[in-house]
Design a protein with these regions (language model features):
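Active-site bordering "gate/hinge" segments
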Residues: 1-170
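Charged, compositionally biased interaction regions
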Residues: 33, 108-117, 125-129, 235-279
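Oxyanion-binding "anion nests"
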Residues: 156-201
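Short, glycine-/Ser/Thr-/acidic-enriched flexible segments
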Residues: 40-42, 81, 134, 144, ...
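Active-site lining segments that contact anionic ligands and/or coordinate catalytic metals
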Residues: 170, 185-187, 194, 217-221, ...
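A short secondary-structure junction signal
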Residues: 46-48, 85-90, 150-152, 184-188, ...
Length: 279
């Protein structure tokens, strides 16, 4: 199925909600395996649509993704194109270099490392992330399952991740650099209460989260990175969250990997720290 920008512009300029019902999306859950190849950022059409039509396009992409991930095998791979480099915010040659490095990894070793880490955490009801500046974030995991991304998920690969119990994440989380809406903020602390980001050490960051709908402020994911060929942070989340020795938390939607927080966005933030078992 082609998701070309020019075709999608024509479709969504006049599409109605009734065009994409459950029967339509149900077709995509019948495949055994799906390879989703990105030559450009899927939600960006390069063309202005009326707000209602753009909202329909976003909902379509979200619902399509939720169905595709139910297939037995689902992988997403980004081609090192100029369009994808532009999305990353990196110089095109630097983007290609970093992507090539992340792809050129020992996949068997990454899978073994991911499976070992997931086994260590399996069955834990609570974990803590300990960071610089004395910050500690505690997350409740009861009833939730660790998942691995080791070559058959999001490529470049290399992470394990879990959806914490949405209302039971508490504490402070520190980021040496927090990348947000194209800006880089240094030495940022986020305050999290009952699963929700409630404040920050930096006013601009606090204002950003305060302006979001509540569901987009909910901590929806924790994931340690496992790819040894990603060696430093660059602000491109797709790579940063895979870096071995880092962790990331995400806020917003997590229904696409079987959890409960339905939201319009999913944003990841990468830091350095240790994830440890509490119980």
């Amino acid at each position: 199925m082609q998701q070309a920008r020019s075709v999608n512009r024509e479709i969504f300029a006049g599409a109605k909600e009734s065009c994409f019902d459950e029967r339509y999306f149900g077709l995509f859950s019948k495949f055994d395996a799906v390879l989703d190849v990105f030559a450009c950022q899927p939600i960006v059409l390069g063309y202005e649509l009326e707000d209602a039509q753009m909202d329909l396009c976003r909902r379509y992409i979200s619902q399509l993704f939720e169905k595709l991930v139910t297939c037995r095998r689902f992988a997403q791979i980004r081609i090192p194109t100029a369009a994808n480099a532009a999305e990353s915010g990196l110089d095109p040659q630097e983007y290609i270099r970093r992507m090539d490095c992340a792809y050129d990894v020992d996949y068997a070793a990454v899978r073994a490392a991911c499976e070992h880490a997931a086994a260590q955490f399996a069955g834990a009801s609570r974990v803590a992330v300990r960071m610089g500046e004395g910050c500690v974030l505690q997350l409740e995991l009861t009833g939730r399952t660790w998942l691995t991304d080791a070559g058959d998920g999001d490529l470049p690969c290399g992470e394990i991740y879990i959806a914490p119990v949405e209302a039971k994440t508490n504490g402070d989380v520190f980021f040496g650099t927090l990348y947000l809406e194209g800006e880089a903020y240094t030495d940022v602390t986020l305050q999290i209460t009952n699963g929700e980001i409630t404040g920050s050490s930096q006013k601009a960051v606090a204002a950003h989260f305060a302006a979001l709908p509540r569901e987009n402020r909910i901590v929806c994911e924790l994931g340690p990175g496992m790819n040894p060929n990603v060696t430093d942070l660059c602000g491109y989340t797709l790579l940063d969250e895979k870096m071995a020795g880092t962790f990331h938390i995400a806020v917003g939607a997590n229904t696409m990997f079987g959890s409960e927080n339905r939201a319009t966005d999913h944003g990841d933030f990468v830091g350095r720290g240790e994830v440890e078992l509490l119980a």
